Each structure stands twice: as structure tokens, then as C-alpha cells.
Amino acid sequence: MARRSRGRFIDGIVLLDKDTGMSSNFALQRVKRLFNANKAGHTGALDPLATGMLPICLGEATKFSQHLLDADKRYTVTAKLGERTDTSDSDGEVVQTRPINFTQELLMESLEHFRGETMQVPSMYSALKHEGQPLYKYAREGIEVPRKARPINVFELNFISLEGDELTLDIHCSKGTYIRTITDDLGEMLGCGAHVIMLRRTQVAGYPYERMVSLEQLNEMVSQAEADGVEAKSVLDPLLLPMDTAVSKFREINLAESQAPYLMNGNPVHASGLVADEIVRITIGEEHKFVGIGAMNDDGMLAPKRLIVIREDEVKA
């Protein structure tokens, strides 16, 4: 007998405002439980120290989470100057203290060094894996593992403020950029050392900051719904963003209703306007119902790459 799926079928994306001190996985499990979702996944972990935008995909939206993992991010970071730690943040041990005596000119020159395309060596205190183990596990055992520099792109690096020994920056960067590493490297360029004391992710892809909601707010909404005698889903579900927002950067190809059965069975279909090697967002009919993503195959037809499951209740609706 097939095992019954736990939770309900619910598709969409929650823009969680993660609180400090909690792991991304803990936040994910709490959201999944509150929405009573059968499936959930986040789109790139935030350190426990960090706060801010953590898009959580529910249901069929999990099929497109990789595209948010690959998306640009924006952060606000505050660094404490004069102290370097072994983890490059305030969770670590201070390993060096130095006086702060750089000039404004040196600060601006140093910031310019990080803008644009550069190579970055990931921190040992990261989740990147070496021989199946996260680097931070080696670091905790005092083992230094060779790491290759990786290409990153800092699209914007804006100076916000310098108050006493605290420097605040706004950074818009490509995926895989370690803000702690930028902070540590900047501290060395300034000659005083630095480490992160506050990190907040303010944007993932083009998602609006204003749509974020915290776990505390979600819990309050559920409690209020129970007090009002209504189902929690009636207040939670309106918070969900459509799953196709995860792939909104791709151009839309709209197909006729008559083509849907062939496509949904995994078969390529004819479509106009296709370009080689381009991933497209596929919609069906006059209502432009999103069904997945695809690309042109060798025969010049639209071949599905990732399709959602259309359930019977959606067909009837």
C-alpha cells in the first residue's frame, strides 16, 4: 500500500524574514508545519547570525528553487573594525586586535577593489563540501583544506556609514558570494581587521522587501485565525507568491490548450519564437497558466525540462 503523503497540496513561495539565531532548516520546518504543506524547500541558507529574506518554496514550487539559488542577492552588513575572528563573524573567537587608523581615502579605495568581477576564496567556515564534508567541520577540528578561488560579481558596493568602530555597507552580488570573506579581506586591506556583527539579506532576485513575513507574524496570524474560528490557511495562503515568480526572468512561450496534453506527457511540441540554448517559461491558453520550463531541442521543437503536476482539483477549478 502506498504511504499517504503528509500535509496538504499547496504551491507557492513564502518570503520569510528569518530571525537571528535560528538555522535556515529550522525556519523551513516551522513554515512547512504552519502551512501544513506536504513539501517544502528553501533557496539558499542564511547563517544563524544573519537575518532577512529566505524564500521558502512549497509544493510544486520546489521544482524551481534552484533558479532562486542562482539569483543575485542584496545584503546590508555591519562590520566591527579592529578585531579579526576565526570565523569572520561575531560567532567566532577573536584572534587578533589592532588599532583603527585608516583614512577615508583608503576606505574608499579599498571598497573599489571589491566591485565588479573578482575571484574569492571561500571561508573555511562555510557549507561548501570537501570529500563529502562541509568545510566548517574541518575548521572546527583545526584542519585547513585547500580551496580554489571562485568567480563572483559585486554589482554594487555602497558605503552607508562609519560610526565609531562599526562600518555598514550595502552589497548587491552574484550567487556564491561570501559577505564574511569580503568583510575579512576589507579589514586586512584597512590594516585593522574586521568581522561581521550584523548581516541582513534584503533581496533575492527581484522579490520585494515589503512582502517578507517573520515566523512571529505567521504564528500570530495562526493564533488569531484560531481565535476567530477560521482555518489558518485562509489567512496564510494569501501570503504566497505564485511559483512562476521563481522563473520570471525567463521569456514566456504561450501554447494553445490543444498542445497541453502532449507537452504534459513529456513530448516536445511546435512553438514559434524559440532560440537555441534559451530556457523559456511555458504557459497554456488564454489564461496563461504556468506549467513549467522548457527549451528548444535539436529538432527545433519546444521540449519540456521541468513541469509541474496539475492535480485533479486544479483541473476542475
Curated annotation (Swiss-Prot):
A Gene Ontology BP annotation from the UniProt entry: mRNA pseudouridine synthesis
Keywords noted in UniProt: Isomerase, tRNA processing
Catalytic activity, reaction form: uridine(55) in tRNA = pseudouridine(55) in tRNA
InterPro entries in the cross-refs: PsdUridine_synth_cat_dom_sf (IPR020103), PsdUridine_synth_N (IPR002501), PUA-like_sf (IPR015947), PUA_sf (IPR036974), tRNA_psdUridine_synth_TruB (IPR014780), tRNA_sdUridine_synth_fam1_C (IPR015240), TruB_C (IPR032819)
Residues of the active site: 47
Any one GO molecular function term: RNA binding
EC number of the protein: 5.4.99.25
Record Gene3D superfamilies: Pseudouridine synthase, PUA domain
Pfam family, one: TruB_C_2
Top-rank taxon: Bacteria
HAMAP family: TruB_bact (MF_01080)
Family: Belongs to the pseudouridine synthase TruB family. Type 1 subfamily.
NCBIfam families: TruB
Main function: Responsible for synthesis of pseudouridine from uracil-55 in the psi GC loop of transfer RNAs.
Protein's name according to its UniProt entry: tRNA pseudouridine synthase B
Species whose genome carries this gene: Shewanella woodyi (strain ATCC 51908 / MS32)
